[in-house]
């Protein structure tokens, strides 16, 4: 059972990284869960909004604006999805 849980988490990480890579025109290998949007990836606020809209659509979660402003790293997105995806 633990393996399935880890696979699900890894899958979430991979999908989030793919969404960001596609949005930013980057290679998947350039992005990790520790990557910071602004500092490491050069993502501006408009692109962050676009990424979060894609994340909402991809995972079927709603990310309110007040929560979205707290998201600074890829790991923040992954953790939010894990906490709010049913």
Swiss-Prot record:
Name of this protein: Acyl carrier protein
Its biological purpose: Carrier of the growing fatty acid chain in fatty acid biosynthesis.
Name of encoding gene: acpP
Cell compartment(s), UniProt: Cytoplasm
Modification after translation, per record: 4'-phosphopantetheine is transferred from CoA to a specific serine of apo-ACP by AcpS. This modification is essential for activity because fatty acids are bound in thioester linkage to the sulfhydryl of the prosthetic group.
GO molecular function: acyl binding; acyl carrier activity
Keyword Nuclease attributed: no
Domain Carrier: 7-85
Family, as annotated: Belongs to the acyl carrier protein (ACP) family.
Organism: Rickettsia bellii (strain RML369-C)
Pfam families assigned: PP-binding
A GO-annotated cellular component: cytoplasm
HAMAP family referenced in this protein's UniProt entry, alphabetically: Acyl_carrier (MF_01217)
């Amino acid at each position: 059972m633990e393996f399935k849980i880890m696979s699900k988490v890894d899958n979430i990480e991979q999908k989030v990284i793919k969404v960001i890579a596609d949005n930013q025109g980057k290679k998947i290998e350039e992005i990790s869960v520790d990557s910071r949007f602004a500092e490491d990836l050069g993502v501006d606020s408009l692109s962050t909004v676009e990424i979060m809209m894609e994340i909402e659509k991809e995972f079927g979660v709603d990310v309110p604006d007040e929560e979205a402003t707290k998201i600074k790293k890829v790991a923040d997105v992954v953790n939010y999805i894990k906490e709010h995806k049913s």
